[in-house]
From Swiss-Prot:
PTM comment, free text: Contains 5 disulfide bonds.
GO cellular component assignments: extracellular region
Tissues/organs with expression: Expressed by the venom gland.
InterPro entries reported in the protein's UniProt record: Elafin-like_sf
Keyword Disulfide bond: yes
Protein name, UniProt field: U14-lycotoxin-Ls1c
The family this protein is said to belong to: Belongs to the venom protein 11 family. 01 (wap-1) subfamily.
Signal peptide span: 1-20
GO BP terms, alphabetized: defense response to bacterium
One example GO MF annotation: toxin activity
Principal location listed in the UniProt entry: secreted
Length: 87
């Protein structure tokens, strides 16, 4: 009996973790018409208030987490520098 209760509680805990996952919001623009981009962040730790560092067409920006997938978080291991990046 105890193992069944444990299994149910474990399943509920896993579902809660999966359903509470947060994402970067979908970017407003799909392309960038500028000749330069500006990275306001390169990793989540560059953002305040538990925001995510999200990749967008015109650079990386901090955004509040979204419940729906659609955006892309910046890879913290990728080569990145904050500020303007010229093509």
């Amino acid at each position: 009996m105890n193992s069944k209760v444990f299994a149910v509680l474990l399943l509920l805990a896993l579902l809660t973790c999966i359903l509470s996952e947060k994402y970067c919001p979908t970017p407003r623009n799909t392309s960038c018409k500028k000749m330069n981009i500006k990275n306001n962040c390169c990793r989540d730790s560059d953002c305040t208030s538990n925001a995510f560092c999200c990749a967008e067409p015109c650079g990386n920006f901090c955004h509040k987490a979204s419940d729906k997938p659609g955006g892309r978080r910046v890879d913290p291991n990728a080569s990145c520098q904050t500020g303007y990046v010229y093509w």
